[in-house]
From Swiss-Prot:
Residues 1-28 are annotated as: Disordered. This is Adenylate kinase isoenzyme 6 homolog. Belongs to the adenylate kinase family. AK6 subfamily. GO terms for cellular component: cytoplasm; nucleus.
Amino acid sequence: MARRNRGVTRRERPNLLITGTPGTGKSTTASALAEATNLRYICIGDLVKEKEFYHGWDNELECHFINEDSVIDELDDAMIEGGNIVDYHGCDFFPQRWFDRVVVLRTENSVLYDRLTNRGYSGTKLSNNLQCEMYQVLLEEAHDSYDEEIVTELQSNTIEDISNNVSTLTDWINAWQP
């Protein structure tokens, strides 16, 4: 439950954003972290599909154009309350006030290539995602969108990396003070 202190709502539990290029392990990391910490896991892609928060389809990239305002309206109360782990491949449209930690997962391109081709990515979609990772687009987006001190970059190449990341983030959540 969120507390009010001099008109300012303070969360009892932190909110984290787990972001990165598709295939970097966001969903695996975020769901394992939610299980380890009893925080709520919110996959934006699933929410968009479930609530139909989209307007059209991008044939070239094979994805929906999401209605960002609908996503924000849907999640605002939960984010004010706190205790959420949000999983999404972008971060620039979320309000800065929502997050106490923004985690950008990074993966070597050879590993990412294998993961994405195993998912059936090809052509422009595969190429765009590999370039996005190579040029650190999501890391730059996070640094441009949030205070430097809350942005963390973690490597996510192996199962061991993911396990270590979950452990590190669990420790951070357990030590977090509102």
